């Protein structure tokens, strides 16, 4: 009875060692998941900042294009008025003003288009960063659960070891009596 109880104690000690090794592994994996989450959060924050800047650039380009469009409309109105009764030089100046306004409008629209394209790319990058952050959070939750399960396994193994030691003590006591 004593040798069987001693074997049970050894088996229980082995089980505790295995459970502790599993817990150590789970904790290492958890630490890795936590650092990945921190990195993903940082990448998301950075992407959000770039997105905000791109949105500001787009808004500014929209405003400039609107102003250039208004200036072009005004220049065409001035040209129409000059056609009605201005002298040659005034008419030529009004025509030049329309040409300049047209060029400025084309340039503003090109910038506007480029800003829009950049904004779309940045929005895509921000969406990817959000997806990666969500994945990292889900992974961390799973690793936390695994670590909790491993800790529970250590407790269960320790309880089994305590019970095996009690049985061994009882067998030794019975043998002594």
Short names for language-model regions:
Residues 1-177:
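Extended amphipathic alpha-helical heptad-repeat regions
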